[in-house]
Regions:
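Bacterial N-terminal signal peptides
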Residues: 5-19
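Active-site neighborhoods of enzymes that stabilize oxyanions during catalysis
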Residues: 28, 32-33, 40, 75-77, ...
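Mature N-terminal segment immediately following signal peptide/propeptide cleavage
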Residues: 28-56, 65-71, 93
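Solvent-exposed loop/turn segments at secondary-structure junctions
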Residues: 54-57, 72-76, 112-116, 141-143, ...
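Helix-loop module immediately N-terminal to the HCX5R catalytic loop
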Residues: 76-104, 220-251
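Thiolate-centered catalytic microenvironments shared by cysteine-dependent enzyme domains
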Residues: 86-177, 181, 201-202, 260-276, ...
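C-terminal soluble interaction/assembly domains
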Residues: 236-238, 243, 248-298
Length: 301
């Protein structure tokens, strides 16, 4: 059994009470902001803008006032699986150093083309109980610079924040949870990988071919348009409907290592679905010889 560092950083009582005691999740009115909105709020005292990606890229130019974050800074060290959430105490310290407080309005933007690194940070903050305070900049840095908005290479001094996380128990799931819900009505297992990995035509290095039995394929890349912005809500909703996901259903998503799937997690939350991330994803499921796999496009939407 794989032990999740994030979940083992708490006592049992905290894990059972966290979701009800604090936190909660954002919604379509708070999870996404435009370049216009960010431009008009850049000088807000409680705003924390985080550029997600390599620090070398951040140093070449970023949104004024932004701070830099790489995914390696919010990934567990010394564990068998890649990109697992670390204990919440470590996450709290990382975001405190970035100036985050419990009353901060946090805006994340991607420094590069794809949004999956940014949605991974969103999920992390959501798991810490800060989801209601956090939004993605639609289109990321490319949208900002494409509109000729100001950028800087200045690395500002950051005043540490005062943040206390309250871990949410309704976000991260493990293989046991997925296995026990494979045929449960109203629970949809969603494979966020590209179709060739889902079908088994392409095999990840050292892993088994195929997908979790009964999973549907909603590739993470299908959620965004050619400019890297999320597609229209009506189009996103239509894709979820075509995959057999109904209003009131729960979405449990996975990918290779728990990064691409956060795009589906984010989109599902945006559309109002209850969502979970199987953090171990295919790297975990595939390594478990006691768990079944399915090959082919049997459940293709």
């Amino acid at each position: 059994m794989v032990i999740r560092p994030f979940l083992t950083g708490f006592g049992l009582a905290v894990a059972l009470q966290a979701a009800a005691a604090c936190g909660g999740h954002g919604d379509r009115g708070s999870m996404l902001v435009t370049t216009e909105w960010l431009s008009s709020h850049l000088k807000d005292d409680n705003l924390v803008v985080i550029g997600v990606g390599p620090q070398t890229v951040f140093a070449q130019g970023h949104i004024p006032g932004a701070v830099s974050l790489e995914l390696s800074e919010i990934s567990a060290k010394g564990v068998a699986l890649t990109l697992e959430l670390p204990p919440v105490a470590e996450l709290t310290e990382t975001f405190r150093k970035l100036g985050v407080s419990n009353n901060s309005r946090i805006v994340l933007y991607t420094l590069q083309a794809s949004i999956q690194s940014t949605t991974r940070v969103f999920l992390t903050l959501d798991a810490m109980g800060l989801g209601k305070n956090t939004a993605l900049l639609d289109g990321g840095y490319a949208a900002w610079t494409g509109e000729g908005r100001p950028v800087t290479t200045e690395i500002r001094a950051v005043k540490p924040g005062a943040v206390e996380a309250c871990a949410q128990s309704d976000i991260i799931v493990d293989a046991g949870y997925v296995s026990s819900n494979l045929k449960k009505p109203g629970v949809n297992i969603v494979d966020a990988r590209l179709p060739d990995f889902y079908s088994g035509r392409q095999i990840p290095n050292g892993q088994r071919a195929g997908h979790v039995p009964g999973a549907v394929n909603l590739p993470f890349s299908s959620m965004v348009d050619e400019k890297g912005k999320l597609k229209r809500e009506a189009d996103l909703s239509a894709m979820f409907t075509a995959a057999g996901i109904k209003t009131g259903d729960r979405v449990v998503t996975y990918c290779h290592i728990g990064q691409q799937a956060t795009v589906i997690y984010f989109t599902a939350r945006l559309l109002g679905f209850d969502a979970r991330l199987y953090d171990g994803s295919w790297q975990d499921w595939s390594a478990r010889q006691d768990l079944p796999v399915e090959v082919g496009n049997i459940h293709k939407p």
